[in-house]
């Protein structure tokens, strides 16, 4: 919240999933206290498709957001990262699928992970499911690396034990790679 206040960023899009939302009361209270207007995106409750992403992107554009706050697992964080990169630019998402095709990012971006598997909060990658061919496609660009990543232990408690176990094993396999 301090990072947003220091930069006088007031219109903040929060990208998260439905299960995480009840845990964010403290965060919303802090944002309100800092004078921020909280804009909630449509929830990212599954692997994000291009259509789900485009709905979030449209909300960001309609609300003229100044910053994006991603809270959740890899899916929510990937959507937050892409939204921050494409909200003010003219590039369509299908044009940036691939490596180093993203032209930049104008919005300040903070990610708060609730899981440990993907590392999305610090990576230059984002994954979307393309409904046209049912293939997962990636965007790889240094412009996707968030300005800040904040790990809050209490947010990890919002995740069901089975998801914690699965993402923990995912993190372990990444270490072994």
Residue ranges and their predicted role:
Residues 16, 40-42, 69, 79, ...:
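General beta-strand structural signal in soluble alpha/beta enzymes
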Residues 65-83, 114-120:
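Glycine/serine-rich anion-binding loops at beta->alpha junctions
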Residues 28, 39, 54-57, 81-84, ...:
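Predominant activation on well-ordered alpha-helical scaffold segments within soluble catalytic domains
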Residues 19, 45-48, 75, 160, ...:
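Catalytic cores of large soluble enzymes that bind and process phosphate-bearing ligands
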Residues 88-177:
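A glycine/threonine-rich phosphate-anchoring loop and its flanking beta-alpha core
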Residues 1-67:
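ATP/NTP phosphate-donor binding region
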Residues 26, 57, 76-89, 122-123:
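Short Gly/Thr/Asp-enriched flexible loops that form oxyanion-binding sites at enzyme active sites
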């Amino acid at each position: 919240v301090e990072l947003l206040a220091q930069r006088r960023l007031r219109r903040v899009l929060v990208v998260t999933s439905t299960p995480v939302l009840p845990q964010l009361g403290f965060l919303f209270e802090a944002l309100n206290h800092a004078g921020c207007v909280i804009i909630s995106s449509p929830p990212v409750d599954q692997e994000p498709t291009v259509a789900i992403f485009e709905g979030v992107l449209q909300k960001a554009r309609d609300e003229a957001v100044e910053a994006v706050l991603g809270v959740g697992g890899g899916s929510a964080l990937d959507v937050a990262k892409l939204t921050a990169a494409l909200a003010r630019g003219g590039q369509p998402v299908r044009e940036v699928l691939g490596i180093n095709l993203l032209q930049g990012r104008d919005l300040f971006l903070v990610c708060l992970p609730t899981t440990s598997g993907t590392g999305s909060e610090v990576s230059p990658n984002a994954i979307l499911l393309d409904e046209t061919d049912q293939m997962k496609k990636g965007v790889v660009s240094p412009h996707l690396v968030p300005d800040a990543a904040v790990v809050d232990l209490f947010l990890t408690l919002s995740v069901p034990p089975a998801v914690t176990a699965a993402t923990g094993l995912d993190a372990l396999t990444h270490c072994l790679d």
